[in-house]
Amino acid sequence: MTAQPPDSALLSVENLHTRFRTSEGPVHAVEGVSVTVDEGEIVGLVGESGSGKSVTARSIVGLQDPGEIVRGSIHLDGVAVTDATDRQLRRLRGDTVSMVFQDPTETLNPVFDIGEQIAESLKVHDQLDSQSLLEYLHVPPFSSRSEWREYRERAIELMAQVGIANPEDRVDAYPHELSGGLRQRAGMAIALASDPDLLIADEPTTALDVTTQAQLLERLRRRNAQRGTAILLITHDLGVVADICDRVVVMYAGEVMETGPTDRILESPRHPYTKALLECLPQRVDRGSRLPTIEGSVPEPTGDRTGCSFAPRCDRATDACRDGEIPTVDLGDDRGTVTCGESSALESHAARSGTATSDGAPESGSATTGSAPGGGPDRSTSPLVELEGVSRRYSLANGPIERLLGTDDTLRAVDDVDLEIRAGETLALVGESGCGKSTLASLLTGLETPTTGTVRIDGTPVGTAADRDAETLADVGVVFQDPRSSLNPRLTVERAIGEPLRSNGWDRSRRRERVQELLERVGLADRHATSYPHELSGGQVQRVAIARAIALDPSVVVLDEPVSALDASVQSRLLNVLADLQADLDLTYLFISHDLTVVEHIADRVAVMYLGELMEVGPADRVFDCPTHPYTRALLEAIPSLDPGGSTGTSLEGDRPSPVDPPGGCVFRNRCPMAEPKCAETDPDQRQFGPVRAKCHIVHE
């Protein structure tokens, strides 16, 4: 065991360099990173994708393979990780540090139930000193039924601690039987089973809706307060950082650009990159106005580097920035450090005066997006899309006898929805995961058929995609949440975009001309036409998906979580592209999202969904400024404030009821802080409150 430096913290990373060997040369994923985390401290690690955040975290716990640490040191609770034996590393991972991964499937084994996996982690922690490697890998680790029962009870207690409701009913569930939020909590329970001194959480909230995110952050905050667990939180969501972190480390291209207390970073960022990141956030821009962007992209981590890696994207860069040695300056008074050769970086600046710029005015001349208050574009009063009494139910019968006897269970995915989308507007559909948003979108696109009710596009009733003619099919474009999974990896960008054109009889020369036009519209170069999906960044792949969706000039485009997994800088570009396309082509958007800050910026109207029903529908400014339904209010209160000293996101307690067995009366009553006896007795009607329609007994004008 290597002695810890006298001034070290619980975690001390000094001048870390991690590289990957490839056939095209070494990839410099991490270049000279230094990070510390004190006992009981919560530190945020932020930056765009490709900045080296996850590789840094994996290097800390010795999971950097196939990469290698070529320089620097990592001290974790007195152990030099870079010099540790396999046994020492196992002890560290089982006792001192644990990791929560962005994708819980990296932690959860699909063939074992949740309780057994948590119990096994508890057992491994209890027997660290006596276990050999073979014993450590032995499954199952329990020698008797009584021992298994003991650890099972402890697993149930741990599940309750991370916020899994009714853990006794879920301890025997398999990962595929849990929602995304519950799987993430199960992964956290496994990580906390060893009672670690340091918890590394890698993008734990990226795919979660706002209320589940608030609940997860509250559990982390509570663990930190009650057990003194230090946390290294990796995220690209600066709202999450403002909510929970004591300090922030800003990374770019494998290097640390700036460090400091969270309040100072948010109020007075010093590095041009930090300022630009903050400027790209919708919360920092007037509703409906054009979002600033950061020109360019994170450089490829190959080849030799000179000067500041951010210089090619920085409008303040000098020749010294591009070619010289960049100093890291301590700001003093515990205000952190900044690595920048530009002298003004050492001076105090407001967070809104950085280097992010407009990415150019839209071709149509419009400088706004969505419904800027008091100045949005005129919208047609006649609806382009109508859903009248639409429901979608799924039979959960186990066999033909249940169907014959009518004793099968029914899942109510969408329940009696009335909704209109006017031509040229953006209607945002929001709500927690599992509320029926994507099913409603599938009913509009024809991927699903309503059990009852009617879907009309431009006044014409439409059925499934198989029943629609070519013209009706072309009326609706779709951008899926995961664009990579919707694109054939064997097709070039040109062929992927041209596929719907080919299906509609376009010849090759006409297709090629149209693809070039579409690439230009979504901001991609001609050279991207010959690229494959795996050769593109996340933002570029999403642009390809958008180009494909509008290839046949649809009147309405369904956007299912189009920017949820993107960094702030890439997200702002995509939102500007969508605004430009809408202005140029008079597109109508159904925008599905769990990111309410994005919805507030882009939407003309908002529809709030819960357990298959619409709780509230109204103009975006009215819904966000003065929510009518208690559920809408709860969603908005769950958004963490980006302003230092602002309120933290308030979690909505309790689990959503099952759509197989929804509660009688109002479906939200068991989680509603304002519920009255009549809420349990009768289902409320949809009522009009000025421009807003809401489904609630207790709301008054």
Regions found by a protein language model. Name each.
Residues M1-E267, S344-D625, E637, R671, ...:
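ABC transporter nucleotide-binding domains
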Residues D7, S23, T262-L384, A397, ...:
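Charged, flexible cofactor/metal-binding loops and thiol motifs
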